[in-house]
Amino acid sequence: MKIVLISVGFVLALESSPVLAQGQVSMERGLQVAIVGGCHSCHTEGYSEAKGKIDPAKAMKGSSVGFRGPWGTTYATNLRQIARLLKEDGFVIMMKHMQTDPPMPWYNVQAMDESDIRSLYQYIMSLGEPGEPVPQQVPPDQEPKTPYIQFAPPQMPKG
């Protein structure tokens, strides 16, 4: 009888454990996904310079600092604006099917569990006003008007 009670107690303790909360969808989990997934590194201006401290006013609003390479100059999207254009199901579909230019690792996003994407959506929607759009992508043969990071050396072959 003691073994059964101890086993039941152990199972009940595990059920409330964060380890088993992996499939649950929540805003808090979305924050964790954004941190561990590296979303803030590009989509939150100043995040890296602040050594990982999230400025709520800037969180997930994208960046006006571009990434320049053979593909042109790309900018981290304002995810608050994107999320507000879509319902949660639409956000999941977009994230599972998108293909973007570098340096966005869209292939990593496509590998994410659906509950992670739904949690990310809930986190983004909790952040407040969407803010301004980021600059448009600049073709490779044009000079960007914003600061940018030279992401690939100019001597790299195109393609």
Protein language model features and the residues they cover:
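Sec-dependent N-terminal signal peptides
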Residues: V4-L14
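N-terminal signal peptide c-region/cleavage motif recognized by signal peptidases
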Residues: S16-P18
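Short, intrinsically disordered, charge-biased short linear motifs at domain edges
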Residues: G23-G30
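Flexible coil segments in periplasmic/lumen-exposed cytochrome c-class electron-transfer proteins
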Residues: V25, V36, T44-T74, P102, ...
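Local sequence-structure signature of Cys/Sec-based thiol-disulfide redox active-site neighborhoods
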Residues: L31-G37
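Short, cysteine/histidine-rich loop/knuckle motifs that typically chelate Zn2+
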Residues: S41
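Peptidoglycan-targeting cell-wall enzymes and recognition modules
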Residues: G72-K87, F91
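An amphipathic alpha-helix signature
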Residues: E88-K96, E114, R118-Y121
